[in-house]
Amino acid sequence: MAPLKPAGASRLINKSHLHQLFVERLNADLHNAQLALQTAHEAATHEENVAENKYDTLGLEAGYLAHGQARRVAEIEQALLAFRALQLRDFDADKGIQLSALVLLESDSGQQRRLFLVPDGAGMKVPTEEGEVMSITPQSPMGQSLLGKAPGDFVRVNGQESEIVEAL
């Protein structure tokens, strides 16, 4: 956990920089998924993987793997498009936490979590000097509980209550 900064100083990273870190992460994930798709496609179409009898399923299994990899590539491409289109907005106390908010939560035990509310690509984590930041979507239970809230409010998800310490 990153040490706390002096009073009045933000314990959250700059959102533009954070946004770029997530885009870079998605680009790297896309590259890896495309390589995996290419490998799976080559295995599925390789002449040695043609079934010789009804029990020889290597080619069929490779085809299923290639299909799954193609879906993964499409999911990452969709998330990347959503991230690139995301307009970063400053926190507005009148509206509360909205899409593109960067939120610092603290549990009763003092554990801090940094969350970035994004349209797609939930569950990704990127390391920062301030601490790890995880992407969540408004469709998730945590995302739903944060929408409209402000620093000082409490949220409860999966039986654990946390205070919203800061929102940008």
What are these regions (language model features)?
Residues H46, T137, R156-V157, E161-S162:
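Alpha-helix boundary/interfacial micro-motifs
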Residues F91-R156:
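Non-DNA-binding regulatory cores of transcription-related proteins
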Residues S109, G159-I164, L168:
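Short, charged beta-turn/beta-strand-edge "cap" motif at the junction between a beta-strand
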Residues A2-D92:
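N-terminal intrinsically disordered, low-complexity, charge/repeat-rich segments that act as generic
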